[in-house]
UniProtKB/Swiss-Prot annotation:
Keywords: Membrane, NAD, NADP, Plastoquinone, Quinone, Thylakoid, Translocase, Transmembrane, Transmembrane helix, Transport. It comes from the Bacteria. It is a multi-pass membrane protein. This is NAD(P)H-quinone oxidoreductase subunit L. It comes from Prochlorococcus marinus (strain MIT 9215). It catalyses: a plastoquinone + NADH + (n+1) H(+)(in) = a plastoquinol + NAD(+) + n H(+)(out); a plastoquinone + NADPH + (n+1) H(+)(in) = a plastoquinol + NADP(+) + n H(+)(out). Belongs to the complex I NdhL subunit family. The keyword Coiled coil does not apply. It is found in: Cellular thylakoid membrane.
Amino acid sequence: METFFNNSFATLIAYIGIISTYLLVIPLFLFYWMNNRWNVMGKFERLGIYGLVFLFFPGLILFSPFLNLRPKGSGKG
């Protein structure tokens, strides 16, 4: 068991897991949450979301060119 903890492969897997969670999983969840709840959030929920946006800003920047959070139009135009 001790060789597992001293193994550089296990360390690499742990780093990949932490970085992918920080840069991919949580920012995508935040985008989903903000897109669905933006107009009905309470003040404390909005404050919490703003804090999470500040905390996970690098991951949100990675996805910002690909995701559109603008309101949907009425279809006329």
